[in-house]
Regions:
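Catalytic-core regions of core metabolic enzymes
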Residues: 1-582
Length: 582
């Protein structure tokens, strides 16, 4: 278990709680349990030593024994003294709110290098801006002054109106960019997004050119996004200034990524699931504006409820985690990190020139900062989508409501394995209530297995009984879409629409719609997360069940296991906020 210093008392207790060897800390053969408060004081003492003495390279306390009364005692310690760590990260000021507004909500956009060739960045980006429904003014430069997609371009920026453009989207070569920035500044441009490559990722000469361009942008008062970036998305103003698709539905997830491909991945998941995006940006080389800068602004952005980030490496680890902690104290922050393995670290370095740090230390620092760390892009998006659409749980007590026994068993296993949630015992009064709605063969336990005894209103009524119970903190609902799956086969068969099938198909589909609506409405009414899961979310997304879940704006999870992982992230973050009085 790792945490960076300085530790707080809460950090120390969480480190102890995170040990895999919890049973060793309990009572054993008449000896007292370990005094966790005293053990936390040992950790706090080591933290104070490390903070006060930067020349301490390592401390090996061996052994740390526990007396019969439970008190820990350090018998011996080896302290290694080395050179003080004098490394310090860069501390560029974050761009202003006005500059970020120019990037994400510009009154006008200029595409430099607009092209009539549909394979060129200058065509694709202009097309995407126009096709996404952006209503601001759109301009383009083209050496021949050609008309591109109905936009009359100009050969020189000097020919454009002053004060009409906030954002320049740069599709011209690196060599042309210094003069271009000067001309844009003269027209009142406040933000520039550079797709141009050939900078810091391309060797020493490129790094010098990048540093010179950053200095020039600072001098001109222009926010410099990129270079070597993919683009920027802002759904509140229907802006899709990108060199690739897609444009996502509107929502409350803000995305910042060092990799443009990960931006595309998150936007694709948004389109698939219907859980929308507020802002998205690929930081590229992050020469002047880092992912942490974007995340810090997202934490202030009224359109954004949760931030989602991909990072490939850590240069200023302490500085980055301090920024992460500041963000997570205000809004949920989900991070997926490349370079977690030795092979991945090498790949990350070759991609954006990023340097990888020790992954275990990074993981511990994320936990300390309240950052939700995901292992995969799927887990990351689903965590962010859950934060964006579900209330935080007030406790770990979880009930599984299922229409099929096997799904409930597997999901119960997932809750136990996750370790953060509690598969609660079904309270006697709740069991008695449910008895009035289900046949005698139902499970009478958690998971609540309806045992095929549902009639028209059973699922919504049982779900409300569970949601209303004061000891229940969260619900995972399994089995939506089963009736609509049968309806699909009826429609595809040769007997439809006769034989009463048209009526029963409509009934089946309406039932699944009612179940999705009930899960959403009850979650809002009682302030408890209610996660709906079925493999039909991916196996048959047009099924009325998952389709109805999407219509509520919430995520329909592809399995109970994935719902449990997302719910565990919610409870972990809720605990982080509660313990720190946030």
């Amino acid at each position: 278990v790792f945490r960076p210093v300085p530790l707080s008392a809460i950090d120390a207790q969480e480190m102890i709680d995170g040990l895999a060897t919890q049973q060793l800390l309990g009572e054993f053969r008449g000896e007292a349990a370990v005094n966790r408060t005293a053990l936390a004081q040992v950790l706090l003492g080591l933290s104070a030593l490390a903070a006060a003495r930067p020349d301490v390279a390592s401390v090996d306390v061996n052994p740390l024994i526990v007396r019969a009364d439970g008190e820990p005692v350090a018998v011996d310690a080896l302290v290694e003294i080395g050179d003080p760590d004098v490394r310090s990260g860069s501390h560029r000021p974050r761009p202003t709110d006005a500059q970020f507004r120019a990037l994400f909500e510009p009154k006008g956009v200029l595409v430099t290098g607009a092209s009539t060739h549909p394979g060129k960045f200058g065509f694709v980006s202009l097309h995407n801006i126009l096709a996404s429904g952006y209503e601001g003014a759109v301009f383009g430069t083209n050496l021949q002054g050609e008309e591109v997609l109905g936009i009359r371009t100009v050969a020189e920026i000097e020919a454009l109106p002053e004060g009409a453009i906030d954002l320049v989207f740069v599709c011209t070569p690196a060599s042309a960019n210094p003069a271009m920035l000067r001309a844009c500044a003269a027209k009142g441009v406040k933000a520039a997004f550079l797709t141009s490559a050939g900078y810091g990722e391309a060797g020493e000469e490129g790094r010098r050119a990048e540093a010179d361009l950053v200095a020039l942008a600072d001098e001109l008062g222009i926010l410099l996004a990129g270079p070597n970036g993919q683009g920027v998305v802002s759904t509140p103003v229907n802006l899709c200034a990108q060199i690739v698709a897609p444009f996502p539905p509107s929502g409350r997830i803000g995305v910042a990524s060092q990799s443009g491909n990960f931006v595309s991945s998150f936007l694709n998941y948004s389109r698939q699931t219907g859980v929308g995006i507020s802002r998205a940006v690929s930081a590229g080389n992050a020469a002047a504006v880092t992912p942490a800068d974007y995340l810090d602004w997202f934490a202030e952005d009224a359109a954004t409820a949760v931030s989602l980030a991909y990072v490939e490496g850590i240069v200023d680890g302490r500085g980055l985690l301090e920024r992460f902690a500041s963000v997570a104290a205000r809004k949920p922050l989900v991070v997926v990190k490349g370079g977690a393995t030795e092979g991945g670290a090498r790949a990350a370095a070759s991609h954006t020139g990023a340097l990888a740090a020790d992954d275990k230390v990074f993981d511990g620092a994320c936990r300390q900062a309240g950052v939700t760390r995901a292992v995969t892009v799927e887990e990351a998006f689903e965590a962010a989508a859950t934060f964006a659409t579900q209330p935080l749980p007030k406790g770990p007590n979880t009930i599984v409501l299922t229409t099929a026994g096997g799904w409930g068993v597997v999901t119960s296993d997932a809750i136990v394995r996750d370790g953060r949630l509690r598969l609660m015992e079904l309270p006697a009064d709740l069991q008695a209530q449910i008895d009035t709605k289900l046949p005698p063969r139902w499970s009478r336990n958690n998971p609540v297995d309806c045992a095929g005894g549902e009639v028209r209103d059973t699922i919504p009524e049982v779900m409300e009984m569970i949601a209303a119970h004061p000891e229940v903190h969260a619900i995972v609902y399994l089995g939506i879409g089963i009736q609509s799956n049968q309806a699909r086969l009826m429609q595809e068969g040769r007997f439809y629409p006769g034989n009463g099938l048209e009526r029963i198909v409509a009934y089946h589909e309406r039932q699944d719609e009612r179940f999705a609506e009930a899960a959403h409405e009850l979650s809002q009414r009682y302030g408890k997360p209610t996660l709906t899961a079925t493999e039909l979310a991916v196996a048959d997304p047009d099924n009325a069940g998952p389709r109805a879940v999407r219509a509520t704006g919430r995520l329909c999870y592809a399995s109970g296991n994935r719902a449990v992982t997302a719910l565990g992230h919610l409870w972990q973050y809720a605990q982080f906020r509660e313990r720190r009085g946030l």
